[in-house]
């Protein structure tokens, strides 16, 4: 489980990125890099870090499912992820 402060920080960064997304797109299209550099640091999407949606774990994140490998494995064994089953060959 990630620290609550880290999870909240990531959520704030996501909100900031969403708030400035359109403005950033316009500034980039106009090649106004000076104004772009005046925007907040956290307005850049590269500052975001993918985290597990269940417990906030930052490592071993699986994009397709939005969770870490540990939670994916647990939920898959419990049969709570539709269409996922243990491989057997």
Curated annotation (Swiss-Prot):
InterPro entries: Ribosomal_uS14 (IPR001209), Ribosomal_uS14_bac/plastid (IPR023036), Ribosomal_uS14_sf (IPR043140). GO terms for cellular component: cytoplasm; small ribosomal subunit. GO terms for biological process: translation. It holds the Pfam family Ribosomal_S14. Signal peptide: none annotated. One of its GO terms (molecular function) is rRNA binding. Keywords: Ribonucleoprotein, Ribosomal protein, RNA-binding, rRNA-binding. PANTHER family: 30S RIBOSOMAL PROTEIN S14, SMALL RIBOSOMAL SUBUNIT PROTEIN US14M. Part of the 30S ribosomal subunit. Contacts proteins S3 and S10. Belongs to the universal ribosomal protein uS14 family. NCBIfam families: PRK08881.1. Binds 16S rRNA, required for the assembly of 30S particles and may also be responsible for determining the conformation of the 16S rRNA at the A site. This is Small ribosomal subunit protein uS14A. It comes from Pediococcus pentosaceus (strain ATCC 25745 / CCUG 21536 / LMG 10740 / 183-1w). The lineage of its organism: Bacteria, Bacillati, Bacillota, Bacilli, Lactobacillales. The gene is rpsN.
